[in-house]
């Protein structure tokens, strides 16, 4: 079986698995490792087809979650950013023995806008998918720029995201197209409604990809979960506001100690 790239570090007793988003790799977490490592045993994963886990083609959400869970510690906290939030959520649903708590960051159980549900317009995602075959690198850059739009450190944050992408071989177009298909089709709203493990949802007030209205809608639909909207942050709050973000994670872990 092909192994995913899985980097472990940290001095804490609590396992915390971090899953990156579309087009990126586990290097995106390096800006907060120093803040979290004294408190957790961190597991930084390159999702199938991304970063140093290149030997994979496009996968469905269920298959990706199953593959990631095969190398996972038992009873970890799972933190998933953007598309990684869908993967972490799917693992929590299908393999709860791996999970003691779930944190999603700038993520949505349904990324696509639907009737009475805010999200990315289907034609925008379809456009990105079409553009991948025309101008691969520029399409990825445009998507990264959207993630930092509106923050005080927007340009700096976008450069950091771009440097993370360029650290390693770019994912194949097939893998990126498969990821966009997950964002376009996944809908875990009903499945997560009955989720009973500790669950925190973190949003950026300025996020142009996951509207903050998602937070209030899910507060009503999922009253057993908690949400935080970070002021001044966009789609990557751990990059623009690393100290505040790390405190959120530490507080969540402390409140949900076993």
Curated annotation (Swiss-Prot):
Gene: bioH
Domain AB hydrolase-1 span(s) in chain numbering: 16-242
NCBIfam families per record: bioH
Record-linked SUPFAM superfamilies: alpha/beta-Hydrolases
Pathway membership: Cofactor biosynthesis; biotin biosynthesis
Complexes and interactors: Monomer.
A molecular function (GO) term: pimelyl-[acyl-carrier protein] methyl ester esterase activity
Protein name: Pimeloyl-[acyl-carrier protein] methyl ester esterase
Keywords annotated in UniProt: Biotin biosynthesis, Cytoplasm, Hydrolase, Serine esterase
Binding of substrate, residues: 22, 82-83, 143-147, 235
């Amino acid at each position: 079986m092909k192994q995913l790239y899985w980097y472990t570090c940290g001095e804490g007793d609590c396992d915390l698995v971090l899953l990156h988003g579309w087009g990126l790799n586990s290097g995106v977490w390096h800006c907060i490792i120093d803040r979290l490592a004294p408190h957790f045993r961190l597991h930084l994963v390159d999702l199938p087809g991304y970063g140093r886990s290149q030997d994979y083609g496009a996968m469905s959400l269920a298959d990706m979650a199953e593959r990631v869970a095969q190398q996972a510690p038992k009873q970890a906290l799972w933190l998933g950013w953007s598309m990684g939030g869908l993967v972490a959520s799917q693992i929590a649903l299908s393999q709860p023995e791996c999970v003691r708590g779930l944190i999603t960051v700038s993520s949505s159980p349904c990324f696509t806008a639907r009737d009475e549900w805010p999200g990315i317009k289907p034609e925008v995602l379809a456009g990105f998918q079409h553009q991948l075959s025309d101008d691969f690198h520029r399409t990825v850059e445009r998507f990264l720029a959207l993630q930092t739009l509106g923050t005080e450190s927007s340009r700096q944050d976008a450069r950091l995201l771009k440097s993370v992408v360029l650290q390693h071989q770019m994912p194949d177009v097939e893998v990126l197209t498969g990821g966009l298909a997950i964002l376009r089709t996944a809908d875990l709203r009903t499945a997560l409604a009955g989720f009973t493990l500790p669950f925190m949802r973190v949003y950026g007030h300025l996020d142009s990809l996951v509207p903050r209205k998602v937070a209030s809608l899910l507060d009503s639909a999922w009253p057993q979960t908690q949400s935080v909207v970070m002021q001044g942050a966009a789609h990557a709050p751990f990059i623009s506001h690393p100290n505040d973000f790390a405190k959120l994670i530490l507080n969540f872990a402390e409140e949900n100690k076993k």
